[in-house]
Each structure stands twice: as C-alpha cells, then as structure tokens.
Amino acid sequence: MSLKYALYPGCAAKGATPELYQSTMAIIGRLGIEVVELQAASCCGAGVISEADPEVALALNARTFAQAEQAGLDVMTICGTCQGVMGAANKRLKDPETRERINRMLAPEGIVYGGAVQVKHLLWIVVREVGLHRVREQIRVPLSDFRIAPFYGCYILRPSWDLGFDDPENPTSLEKIIRAVGGESVAYAGRTKCCGFPIILEKEAIAVAMAGQNMKEAKEEGADFMVTPCPLCHMSLDIYQDRAGQAVRTPLNLPILHLPQLLGLAMGIPAKELGLSRHLVSVDSIVRTVEKRRDSELRTKNL
C-alpha cells in the first residue's frame, strides 16, 4: 500500500542542506511513500515573517496548503522548523473567520483554502503511518555498532497544542526509529533543547554555547553520532561545531545525520546517494563501519 503526500521540502533542503532532500528521495520509495512536490509553494516564514506581519505569514502558508488541498493530499514536511511554523499556521486557519480573512488576501491569485489539509513531518509519518514494522523489514545493515543521540530541537515538539504528536518533555519517536534500525539510543538532557540557530545571527556566542552544551552532554553519554529531524538544527550542530566546541572547551567531533540519512544507511543505500560527503564534520568513520558490516553480511549470504 502506498502513502501519498504533497511534499513541502522547505527552503533549507533546496538550499543549504540539499543532502536532506537527496536522502529523503532515496528512502521514501522503500517505505511505500509517494510524493507530489509542491513546486510553487511559499517559504513557511520560519517564525520570522510572523513577527513582522502575522497575517502575511498566515497567507503564505494558506497559499501552500491550498495547493496541497487542490491535489487532495496532506502535506509532508522534512524540516522540524517548517513543521512547527506550518502546524501552528494550519491550526489557526481551522478557524472559519481567520480562514475567510486570509482567503480574501489570496483572492487576487484565485486561491481559496478550505482548511482540510493536515501537515505531517516525515518523522511522524514513518512512526505512525508507515509503521516501525515496515522500517524493520527494509533494514539491510543494522546499526548495532552505534550509540545514537536523538536531537529533536524546538519546533517539532513545541508548542504541543499546535503539534500534538509527541510529548514535548519526553518524546519517543526518534528513539523508536533508532531502535528500529538496530542502534542504541542515548539518553541525555539536551535532546529536547534549542540548538541555538534562531539567535545565531544576533547572539552567536550564546547560540554556539547552546549547541555545544547539547553535543557535549551527548558525547559524555557515549554517543557516536547524533540524528535530527530539522535541517536548521543540523546546520547549527554541524557547521558551527568547531566554535561550539570552543565555547564549551571540549573537542566534539560528533557527526550529525539527518533523519533520512540514518534510515538510508540502515537500508544499505550507498553513502553517495545519501549526500553524506556534504557534512562539515566527517561521517567517514560511520560509513566505513556500515560498509564493512554490509560487505560481511553479503559474503555470509553468498556462502
């Protein structure tokens, strides 16, 4: 059975982190997910536009939702920040008066949003709609050699009344996926904290210290690498990792994977197809371990 969604990749996956888009497209077919990409979608606003003009932010997202609604599909996001912003906007657009007001703004484009669309992150879809049993069926190289730190960030968890999927204080969805791919999930205090990205342009020293503290805690608990469902978290943790390590006076060297890269590695998809060479913090040691295990299992099967 195929699950079909309107794919909203967001800006980061088509710009600064194309490996997120690449790895998403590499895994979804194996999970029975079919997508129609929203080619004319707007930026979600990332919480910035709503600060300047909440009505414009709602209109931008209603415009995107209307495209999915016209196709008869729910929206699939692959960015935790997009999920948080769009989930909040969609909840407000369920109110008929709000929706009518925003539709008047969209009228010159001939666009009307009826409020029927749901917005779902890939993480939620995999856990709840694909099912962990199907994930386990697709595993070719169990990641049993690794202790993996989940990092949720803010927007995919809070505010819970706009999102409503995972417990904002004690989420479990990433941990379930880590176990499904054969890894050991690392428990640490920073997994639900902010990555620092929202303030990185204004207060870089504070932002990198926040990121550094989260990674330091994960390393202290024995994490081999970290996985996140948000590309903005990924940028904060990967691109700024050297400065983050300096801020907390700890050499980190902690690889950061996108969620679909984690799934793809365990499915036996080659590293090149997952865009793993794009990371600033090298993931080569992880790839070598996975490839060695994959080759060993292939030799065993051929005996």
How would you name each of these model-derived features?
Residues 1-303:
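Iron-sulfur cluster-binding electron-transfer modules in prokaryotic oxidoreductases
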